[in-house]
Amino acid sequence: MEPILQVQHLTHTYSVGTPFQRSAVEDMSFDVYDGEFLGIIGHTGSGKSTLIQHLNGLLRPTSGQILLHGKDIWAEPKKIRDVRFQVGLVFQYPEYQLFEETVYKDIAFGPINQGKTGEELDRCVREAARLVGIRDDQLDKSPFELSGGQKRRVALAGVMAMDPQVLVLDEPTAGLDPAGRENLMANIRDY
């Protein structure tokens, strides 16, 4: 079986050529296969968030490659948007991803940018909301009025609604109580 995603000798250095130059990730390599759960563990400041921002092209490597289905995601920089639809990323802090006036509109943003409309769009939004435990009566609320755990669910639903092949989660259960963590992880496994 071929890996869906490959990280090959990834290095990321911030502020190259300045007195503030600092390597956040050095010579990292791993493969991700269909259906696989992969956890990346490390201390605060060890480069985990920097690493995952490379997986869908939010950051460009200083050296090394990210391959999606065997193809370097940066081989055609104009197509990086397509990579972001295939590799969905949920940030550690969901408020970085939320900006619409309602939960529904926030979840719908990605699918709309994929060209989905009408019933197809509504189905994507409602199914993603259901998967993460967002009730229909919450869809008309402002995402900014929600608790931290609920904001995290909205951010996750917004990414899941795009139906990415790879789902990358930065601290997915932070802010959730034990029952919420268990429920969310079960729903992600079913995804």
Residue positions per predicted region:
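ABC ATPase NBD Q-loop/coupling interface
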Residues: 16, 65-82
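Conserved ABC ATPase "signature" region
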Residues: 119-137
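Catalytic Walker B motif of ABC-type/P-loop ATPase nucleotide-binding domains
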Residues: 167-170
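The feature captures the beta-strand-to-loop junction immediately N-terminal to the Walker
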Residues: 41-43
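Conserved catalytic motifs of ABC-family nucleotide-binding domains
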Residues: 163
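Helix-to-loop junction immediately C-terminal to a conserved catalytic motif
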Residues: 56
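Conserved ABC ATPase signature
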Residues: 142-146, 150
